[in-house]
Amino acid sequence: FSHPVAVAEILAEQQLDDATIVTALLHDTIEDTTSSKDEITKQFTPEIADLVDGVTKLTNMQLTSTETKEAENVRKLLMAIAQDVRVILVKLADRLHNMQTIKSMKPEKQLQKARETMEIYAPLAGRMGMQSIRQDLEDLAFRVLNFEGRASIIKRFVVLQKENGDVIQRITDDMHSELEASGIRATICLLYTSDAADDWSSV
C-alpha cells in the first residue's frame, strides 16, 4: 500500500485536484486486485473509475523499444490513449516512485526502466509542464545508465561552482542594483538544470 500513497503524495505536492489524488491511491486496483471498473464506479465516481481505467491501459502497454527515433511516436501514442491528461500525470508520478525504488529490481530490469524513463517519460513530463518531475526522472535514470559519468559530472560541477561562485555573486549583485535603480523590486534566484541528463539522452 506504500506505493499508491507515495504516488498520491507526489501529485499532492503538485497541487492537483482531489479526483487525481484518489486515482493515484487506486491506480493499481484493477491490475492487482479482483476489483473492476464498475466496482470503482459504485464505490467512488464514474470520473475516478475512468481515470483508474486509463492508467491501467497505459500500464498494460508493452514498450518494446525506446530507440530515440521511435520514442516520439510512443509518447504520442500515450497521449492519444489517455483521453484525460490526468491519466498521464498519475502515470508520471507512478514512474517517478518506481525510479525512486529501482534498486529493488534486477539489474536488467533497472536498465530497461531507466531507458524508458529517459527516452519516454522524462520528455513527456517536460511536455506536460512538470519540470521538477522531469528533472527527477532524468537524474534517477542517469544514475542507472551511467553512474560513473554522473558522479564525475557532479564532482566537476562542485569544482566549477567554487571557482565561479564569486563571479556569479557579483553578476547577481549588479543585476539587483540595476533593478533597484529602475524602481523594480525583485528576487534573483539561481536555477541549476540537469543538462547532463539532457546530453546523455542524445548519446
Set out the residue ranges of the language-model regions.
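Active-site helical microenvironments for divalent-metal-assisted chemistry
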Residues: 1-191
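Single conserved hydrophobic/aromatic residue that forms the stacking wall/gate
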Residues: 192-203
